[in-house]
């Protein structure tokens, strides 16, 4: 009897604690549709000399379509090259199982905006929104990402 109670308690605890609800930073519903977005997380960071670049991801859903919001931040005391997104831009994620997931940028050109901070650094902020192709979201659930490649308007970067 003790074992049955312990097993029942374990199963109930496991089911209730197994998955926490998704926390949204944006959750909007209006006459146009619905939009939900999660918190941004830093995915990649590169530092070399006085140059640094950061990539942040957040998941979003717009009217039932899953999206990946990408925020590129480049900092430098020297020249900061503009990496532009356009309708031909793509984000490739190679998984540990060898498969490659391709995300397609929405039909919107964006080269970011330049800001200078109080320390004399030029900061380029470039946002982008990528759409998941059919069944690619399911592949991401099965295997972790090993390499990320971004195809910009004029360049490709790993």
Describe the role of every protein-language-model region.
Residues 1-24:
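Bacterial Sec-dependent N-terminal signal peptides
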Residues 19-158:
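A generic "folded-domain core" signal
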């Amino acid at each position: 009897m003790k074992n049955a109670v312990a097993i029942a308690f374990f199963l109930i605890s496991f089911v209730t604690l197994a998955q926490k609800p998704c926390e949204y930073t944006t959750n909007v519903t209006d006459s146009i549709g619905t939009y939900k977005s999660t918190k941004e997380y830093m995915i990649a960071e590169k530092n070399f000399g006085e140059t640094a670049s950061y990539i942040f991801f957040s998941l979003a859903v717009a009217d039932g379509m899953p999206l990946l919001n990408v925020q590129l931040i480049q900092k430098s005391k020297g020249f900061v090259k503009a990496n532009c997104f356009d309708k031909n831009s793509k984000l490739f994620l190679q998984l540990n199982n060898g498969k490659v997931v391709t995300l397609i940028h929405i039909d919107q050109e964006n080269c970011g905006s330049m800001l200078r901070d109080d320390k004399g650094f030029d900061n380029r902020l470039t946002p982008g929104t990528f759409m998941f192709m059919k069944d690619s979201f399911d592949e991401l659930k099965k295997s972790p990402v090993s390499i990320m490649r971004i195809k910009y308007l004029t360049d490709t970067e790993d």
